[in-house]
Amino acid sequence: MTTGPATPPQTNHAEDRTEWPIQVLRAAPETYLLQEILKLAEVAIDTDGHPPFSDQTLIQLRSANAPLLILLSYVPAAPEVPAALAGVAVVLEHDGQPASGTLELVVHPTYRNQGVGQVLLKSLQSARGFESLNAWSHGSHAAAQQLADQFGFEAVRALRRLRLALDAGHQLPAASLPTNISLRSFVPDQDEAAWLAVNAAAFAHHPEQGETSLADLKSLMEEQWFDAAGFLLAVDETDQIMGFHWTKIHAAPAGHQAIGEVYVVGIAPAAQGKGLGKALTLAGIDYLQKKGLSSIMLYVDADNTAAVSLYQSLGFARWDADTMYSYPSATNSNNKFQ
């Protein structure tokens, strides 16, 4: 983090009389500014029912040497009035991949439909450009689609959010583990290295998950929601990890109930094709149900038909979706979805 006060926001004079001053940071924010960003995110969660930033982005916002570009839009105010955040855009640049980044953007509900998103994207275009940039729309808002169209981004990936209602009449089959496999919980300061190896192998073709580092893992373990007991490991007779189901419980935001999540399910390549994925999924759901939760959610790529079919067979139904947009120069046309 920077050691002194952040640079005062500069007004974007290209806009009309309703100007939204913009501040650009090329590093993780100072503590006070991080708290303001997180407060804005919480307000958005209360309104939208889902977070505007991924866990990875939240980790990087707290990391001193994170490869970040942050743009903050402020509410126009008199000089003596403390500036309030109207919106935030965060670009996480990917290590080892020049000019390759992932954008997430959120506008305070009070200031939506007033041009804040446009100002943030115009400022981002000036500060960085859109080359090799992917952008997530969490919840696939219509306003995000309009911004994507306006700035020339194209939809390239759909991530479905599914939900399972655990009412009294819904019975799930018991988890049936393969022979010589047993379940235990993750043990902090013991299982990190072994889990990272299995996670990397299980998600070798899924960089968002497979590139999780020890620092990333430790940051997640420091989150308030982390529960080692709900981090289930499938181990063989030598205690080697063959798979895992990391569960998560989202605290109840205003107007919403607490909800469990099938956070990550991963299977070591040597154990794939043996039914372990389904067994771990069921074991995690059972754990969450015993915590008193009545709803379970998960994310799954829309084109992962095998996983979608499995979850639907267990009673999961579509809730909403996230959409990834990409600037054309960074888009492989073969990956576009219709």
From Swiss-Prot:
Binding-site residues for 1D-myo-inositol 2-(L-cysteinylamino)-2-deoxy-alpha-D-glucopyranoside, renumbered to this chain: D55, E208, K248, E261, Y299
The EC number(s) this enzyme carries: 2.3.1.189
Enzyme class per UniProt: transferase
GO molecular function, one term: protein-N-terminal-alanine acetyltransferase activity
Pfam families noted in UniProt: Acetyltransf_1 (PF00583), Acetyltransf_7 (PF13508)
Record keywords: Acyltransferase, Repeat, Transferase
Binding positions for acetyl-CoA 1 per the UniProt entry: L105, V106, V107
UniProt protein name: Mycothiol acetyltransferase
Organism: Renibacterium salmoninarum (strain ATCC 33209 / DSM 20767 / JCM 11484 / NBRC 15589 / NCIMB 2235)
Taxonomic lineage: Bacteria, Bacillati, Actinomycetota, Actinomycetes, Micrococcales
